[in-house]
Curated annotation (Swiss-Prot):
It is an enzyme of class 2 (transferase). GO terms for cellular component: cytoplasm. One of its GO terms (molecular function) is UDP-N-acetylglucosamine 1-carboxyvinyltransferase activity. GO terms for biological process: cell division; cell wall organization; peptidoglycan biosynthetic process; regulation of cell shape; UDP-N-acetylgalactosamine biosynthetic process. This is UDP-N-acetylglucosamine 1-carboxyvinyltransferase. Pathway: Cell wall biogenesis; peptidoglycan biosynthesis. It is found in: Cytoplasm. The gene is murA. Cell wall formation. Adds enolpyruvyl to UDP-N-acetylglucosamine. UDP-N-acetyl-alpha-D-glucosamine binds at R93, R122, P123, V124, D125, Q126, D305, I327. It catalyses: phosphoenolpyruvate + UDP-N-acetyl-alpha-D-glucosamine = UDP-N-acetyl-3-O-(1-carboxyvinyl)-alpha-D-glucosamine + phosphate. Belongs to the EPSP synthase family. MurA subfamily. HAMAP family: MurA. It comes from Bordetella parapertussis (strain 12822 / ATCC BAA-587 / NCTC 13253).
Length: 422
């Protein structure tokens, strides 16, 4: 099992390119099921989750070709299997995103209940509620969501909570439904907007994406299209937290600063110097960061996917920060591992109190989920001595060659196998 060996204490300097967003790429790949014509996607990140999605689509009969430049060409003109099996779904919750497209185009689907990061229940009940409102008959059978519909019919749907994957699933189902669908309490995330922009290129009629009310007028069929996946705002934020904790001066190319308002505001508050252009961000930190608190919220609030990384920065900051996790339960599993590095953190329910220390010291730590992995890497970069991060398969689910990019910025970080660390 691979690990990351980090020798901390070196500031980060230089520039790297931000990859395409994982949370946009996954639903966009699943949207290939909505048409028999080719879909050409650029800026698709090389991640375990995108590879798993491509394997899942391939199992269904979707043909996919991946080029070295991040371009993926998909064609779903020979789909012969409408089931998403447990062995593929168990590692990735986003695999539920095939449900809406399969049901909309083929009238049936059998999708295993999903897995993924162990950071809360994240139930699929809102997906089921919305698809049922569109006329689907849905049952849970032997661990599978089994759905059938002759043709979906437009409806007004208000989810009980804001759900990103729920909005995406219902959006993909609604584009081929008969009549008009209104999604109330819809997610506003840039990744939802990116999916909608692709669907519009494919011939869908969508208005209001980026607001909490999306209106979809269904069409009979969609056609092929060419689309570039939006830049990953979480990867960009992670690298900026890293330079905030370790110090230095970095530039991120291919970024989307207009999607990162809440994160950039927090980093400025922490003492980073931030400069932005249309597709780049420069972040510099000279000296010790200031402690900065945050409350996670749906977009455009501070993203739950940035909570662990900000906490890692706060561990070496001057002062005390209070972080409140409002989106997921059980999303403080990185705290125990940060404390192994010398962090001073107390947890009370959904609230974490982080008292900054002058220095962390390297140790062996274990990743528990995707963003927790990133927080441990950030802490390792800021720590004195050597840090060994175990179970980095979590990191590989959502970061495209993170250690390669960090080395390009001057970090002392290497991927090693279990044998090399024995």
């Amino acid at each position: 099992m691979d690990k990351l060996r980090i020798t901390g204490g070196s500031p980060l300097r230089g520039e790297v390119t931000v990859s395409g967003a994982k949370n946009a790429a996954l639903p966009i790949l699943c949207a290939s099921l909505l048409t028999a014509e080719p879909l050409v996607l650029g800026n698709v990140p090389q991640l375990n989750d995108t590879s798993t999605t491509l394997r899942l689509l391939g199992r269904m009969g979707v043909r996919a070709e991946r080029a070295g430049d991040g371009t993926v060409t998909l064609q779903a003109d020979q789909v012969d299997n409408l089931e998403a099996p447990y062995e593929l779904v168990k590692t990735m919750r986003a695999s539920i995103l095939v449900l809406g497209p399969l049901l909309a185009r083929f009238g049936q689907a059998r999708v295993s209940l999903p897995g993924g990061c162990a950071i809360g229940q994240r139930p699929v009940d809102q997906h089921i509620k919305g698809l049922a409102a569109l006329g689907a008959e849905i049952e849970i059978e032997h661990g599978f969501v089994v759905a059938r519909a002759t043709r979906l019919k437009g409806a007004s749907i208000r989810t009980d909570m804001v759900t990103v994957t729920g909005t995406e699933n219902l959006l993909m189902a609604a584009v081929l439904a008969e009549g008009q669908t209104v999604l109330e309490n819809a997610a506003r995330e840039p990744e939802v907007v990116d999916l909608a922009e692709l669907l519009i290129k494919m011939g869908a009629r969508i208005q209001g994406h980026g607001t909490d009310r999306i209106v979809v007028d269904g069409v009979a069929r969609l056609h092929g299209a060419r689309h570039d996946v939006i830049a990953d705002r979480i990867e960009a934020g992670t690298f900026l937290c890293a330079v905030g904790a370790a110090g230095g001066d970095i530039t991120l190319r291919g970024a989307a600063p207009d999607t990162m308002g809440a994160t950039l505001d927090k980093l400025v508050e922490a003492g980073l110097t931030i400069e932005t252009g249309p597709d780049w961000i420069r972040g510099a930190m000279h000296g010790r960061p200031c402690a900065v608190g945050a409350r996670t919220h749906e977009y455009p609030g501070f993203a739950t996917d940035m909570q662990a990384q900000l906490m890692a920065l706060d561990t070496v900051a001057d002062g005390t920060a209070v972080i409140v996790e409002n989106i997921f339960e059980n999303r403080y599993m990185h705290v125990q591992e940060l404390c192994r590095l010398g962090a001073d953190i107390d947890i009370d329910g959904h609230t974490a109190v982080v008292r900054g220390v002058a220095r962390l010291s390297g140790a062996t730590v274990m990743a528990t989920d995707l963003r927790a992995s990133a927080s441990l890497v950030i802490a390792g970069l800021a720590a004195e001595g050597e840090t060994l991060v175990d179970r980095i398969y979590h990191l590989d689910r959502g970061y495209d060659r993170m250690e390669v990019k960090l080395r390009a910025l001057g970090a002392s970080i290497q991927r090693v196998t279990g044998k090399e660390t024995a």
